[in-house]
Amino acid sequence: TDDFTATNAEIATAYEKFNDTENVDLSLLLCGPSQTGADATGDTKATAVMDIATARKDCVAFISPARTDVVGVANAITQTVNVKNFANGLPSTSYAVIDSGYKYMYDRYNDVYRYVPLNGDTAGLCARTDSVADAWFSPGGFNRGQIRGAVKLAFNPNQTQRDDLYKARVNPVANFPGQGT
């Protein structure tokens, strides 16, 4: 682009390189942040990543909601509704994992704290579980589901909110006192 800022549509086009199952070996496909200024919902990029995983049938897409759905939203009920609406706007597939948000972490390269989407962490947990256990073991829970480097979560759903998110195909990430994230 001429302004050096890629839109979600341009990023979705770049993801099309992953459609080639013969030349591209792929197990985990990360969406990254689900929002840029040109596509406030993030649906374009998330849908493209999900479509690739669904078509290939040999990988899993990892999706986080749009940053504005959870970061800077003071009310947890609104965050729950936002995340559910985001997930409901995406196609349904067995080849994608949608998580509930962003973690606040220290960026040692820029010496600042920032919010980062959890889809990279979720994919990392899946990769780690595959290496220490077997692919059919859950990467969640207190033993295998610890998110590293999280200072806090932008959205820490309670039990009722987690139940609502499960119904919307969202895998909630929560912080439990004494257990971590």
PLM segments and residue spans:
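A glycine- and small-residue-enriched flexible loop/hinge signal that marks low-structured segments
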Residues: 1-181
